[in-house]
């Protein structure tokens, strides 16, 4: 009974938390990639 309550309370938050963390990580990586490309373009244009 305790395990079932624990799993019901922790299941959805863990899944949602993982999805949020993954989305933030993807956004962070994409920002770094685009910033890196912009820096390369600026340095090659000079």
From Swiss-Prot:
<dbReference type="GO" id="GO:0006099">
    <property type="term" value="P:tricarboxylic acid cycle"/>
</dbReference>
<keyword id="KW-0999">Mitochondrion inner membrane</keyword>
<comment type="pathway">
    <text>Carbohydrate metabolism; tricarboxylic acid cycle.</text>
</comment>
<keyword id="KW-0472">Membrane</keyword>
<protein>
    <recommendedName>
        <fullName>Succinate dehydrogenase subunit 8, mitochondrial</fullName>
    </recommendedName>
</protein>
<keyword id="KW-0496">Mitochondrion</keyword>
<keyword id="KW-0816">Tricarboxylic acid cycle</keyword>
<comment type="subunit">
    <text>Component of complex II composed of eight subunits in plants: four classical SDH subunits SDH1, SDH2, SDH3 and SDH4 (a flavoprotein (FP), an iron-sulfur protein (IP), and a cytochrome b composed of a large and a small subunit.), as well as four subunits unknown in mitochondria from bacteria and heterotrophic eukaryotes.</text>
</comment>
<dbReference type="GO" id="GO:0045273">
    <property type="term" value="C:respiratory chain complex II (succinate dehydrogenase)"/>
</dbReference>
<dbReference type="GO" id="GO:0005743">
    <property type="term" value="C:mitochondrial inner membrane"/>
</dbReference>
